[in-house]
């Protein structure tokens, strides 16, 4: 029987995402100047205030206030009427040295024996319902907000947009678990106070449907069939009406509160650990990326149509407690999920140091992950600039989203005898 499934996303200007982006900007700066830095950084943003707190073990000393201001500036909080503005907000730092008790569980004489930074379980998921092996509802929800932010920055077709926004997409699936149509789209965007509430609502609704949606269809042709007009999509645009007060002034934001937006939109599973603000010694982050890498390569290799991969750790122990695989009955090989897991365990070294090396995670690559999802993004090589506390500028050439590479497809096919 057909069923509905929904996923949501939030924009870079959403308060929780502002916090994530500040935390990850600090991670990047520490790693740029000290690749061996151990960092756990949490951020709180509210009306006119930013609070930074966390633990650090590093040789680098940073101007954390200026780094935070630059992130806020880049997002677009640059006007005093937002009640949260890059140049004038107060920034309090309570960042201190990492506990020696925690560090002794991670550091080892041999790097290969580096222990997990904490206990826990992490999940990776992939499906062939989109070209980037991500759930379609989440992919669409992200794309809506990416293009909405682009329209805001361009400031031509829609001039009243402010940084805070949310989207939600509901899809109908058929009996074979394939998406067949979009049932509903919910989009709420912060905006200037430019007319009466009724006129603003009508204008925003019209612009989203007549400007944003055609832009999505034009830029992402693969989604054209879902907007062909054959089935009526229910649109709920700013359903509460006026949305002038938003961002950190409207809601307090915290690092790590959008973990489902960051991953698979409710598909698969989540171990509960957030990513942003954590260096790669924290397996909450590194192992989640590694399991996504495994899942994506398994599906791309034709092993299955959909897969969930779990790995678990004990703090201070390098070898995982176990690896679990669930192909949801879609496996194309004559092996059960337990047998598949055994081969996966041999194929992918899941010790923390091995993950760091395989995915090049000791590089400043995290700011780009902090909005619009950590998964399903395009791997690319970029050159990034970082400014030290004494004004020194260094440039780093890094590869982003390495866990999205399909570099193990041939190895998977060989290991499972897939032709």
Swiss-Prot record:
The scientific name of the source species is Cytophaga hutchinsonii (strain ATCC 33406 / DSM 1761 / CIP 103989 / NBRC 15051 / NCIMB 9469 / D465)
Q: What is its EC number?
A: 2.5.1.6
* Protein's name according to its UniProt entry: S-adenosylmethionine synthase
One GO cellular component term noted in the UniProt record for this chain: cytoplasm
Looking up Pfam families in the UniProt record yields: S-AdoMet_synt_C, S-AdoMet_synt_M, S-AdoMet_synt_N
What does this chain do?
Catalyzes the formation of S-adenosylmethionine (AdoMet) from methionine and ATP. The overall synthetic reaction is composed of two sequential steps, AdoMet formation and the subsequent tripolyphosphate hydrolysis which occurs prior to release of AdoMet from the enzyme.
From what superkingdom does this record's organism come?
Bacteria
**Pathway where this protein functions:** Amino-acid biosynthesis; S-adenosyl-L-methionine biosynthesis; S-adenosyl-L-methionine from L-methionine: step 1/1
Task: State where ATP binds.
Answer: 14, 164-166, 242-243, 251, 257-258, 274, 278
Which GO BP terms sit in this record?
Answer: one-carbon metabolic process; S-adenosylmethionine biosynthetic process
Task: Look at the named UniProt entry and state the broad enzyme category this protein falls under.
Answer: transferase
Q: Which GO terms describe its molecular function?
A: ATP binding; magnesium ion binding; methionine adenosyltransferase activity
Give the chief site where it resides.
cytoplasm
How does the cofactor attach, per the note?
Answer: Binds 2 divalent ions per subunit.
- Region Flexible loop, residue ranges: 98-108
Q: Which reaction does it catalyse?
A: L-methionine + ATP + H2O = S-adenosyl-L-methionine + phosphate + diphosphate
Similarity annotation: Belongs to the AdoMet synthase family.
Lineage of the organism? Bacteria, Pseudomonadati, Bacteroidota, Cytophagia, Cytophagales
UniProtKB keywords = ATP-binding, Cytoplasm, Magnesium, Metal-binding, Nucleotide-binding, One-carbon metabolism, Potassium, Transferase
Q: Which SUPFAM superfamilies match?
A: S-adenosylmethionine synthetase (SSF55973)
* Signal peptide start and end residues: none
**Ligand binding (K(+)):** 42
This protein's assembly is summarised as: Homotetramer; dimer of dimers.
């Amino acid at each position: 029987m057909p069923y509905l499934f929904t996923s949501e996303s939030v924009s870079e200007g959403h308060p929780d995402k502002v916090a994530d982006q500040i935390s990850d900007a600090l991670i990047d700066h520490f790693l740029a100047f000290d690749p061996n830095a151990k960092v756990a950084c949490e951020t709180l943003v509210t009306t006119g205030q930013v609070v930074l707190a966390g633990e650090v073990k590093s040789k680098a000393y940073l101007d954390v206030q200026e780094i935070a201001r630059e992130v806020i500036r880049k997002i677009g909080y640059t006007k005093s009427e937002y009640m949260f503005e890059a140049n004038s907000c107060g920034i309090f730092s309570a960042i201190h040295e990492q506990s020696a008790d925690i560090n002794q569980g991670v550091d080892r004489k041999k790097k290969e024996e580096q222990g997990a930074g904490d206990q826990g379980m992490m999940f990776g998921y992939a499906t062939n319902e989109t070209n980037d092996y991500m759930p379609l509802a989440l992919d669409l929800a992200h794309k809506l907000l990416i293009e909405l932010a682009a329209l805001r920055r361009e400031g031509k077709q829609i001039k009243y947009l402010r940084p805070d926004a949310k989207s939600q997409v509901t899809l109908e699936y058929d009996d074979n678990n394939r998406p067949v149509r979009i049932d509903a789209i919910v989009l709420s965007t912060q905006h200037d106070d430019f007319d009466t509430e009724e006129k603003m609502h009508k204008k925003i609704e019209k612009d989203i449907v007549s400007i944003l949606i055609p832009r999505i269809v034009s830029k992402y042709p693969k989604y054209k069939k879902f907007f062909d007009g054959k089935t009526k999509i229910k649109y709920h645009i700013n359903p509460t009406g006026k949305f002038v007060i938003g961002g950190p002034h409207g809601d307090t934001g915290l690092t790590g509160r959008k973990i489902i937006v960051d991953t698979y939109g409710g598909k698969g599973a989540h171990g509960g650990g957030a990513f942003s603000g954590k260096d790669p010694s924290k397996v909450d982050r590194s192992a989640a990326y590694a399991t996504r890498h495994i899942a994506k390569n398994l599906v791309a290799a034709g092993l299955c149509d959909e897969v969930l991969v779990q790995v678990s750790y004990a703090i201070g122990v390098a070898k995982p407690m176990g690896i679990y695989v669930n192909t949801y009955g879609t496996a194309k090989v004559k092996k059960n999920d337990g047998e598949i897991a055994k081969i996966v365990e041999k194929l992918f070294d899941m010790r923390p140091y091995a993950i760091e090396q395989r995915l090049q995670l000791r590089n400043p690559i995290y700011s780009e992950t902090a909005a619009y999802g950590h998964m399903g993004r395009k791997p690319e090589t970029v050159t990034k600039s970082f400014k030290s506390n004494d004004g020194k500028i260094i440039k780093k050439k890094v590869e982003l989203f390495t866990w999205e590479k399909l570099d193990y497809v041939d190895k998977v096919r060989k290991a499972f005898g897939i032709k």
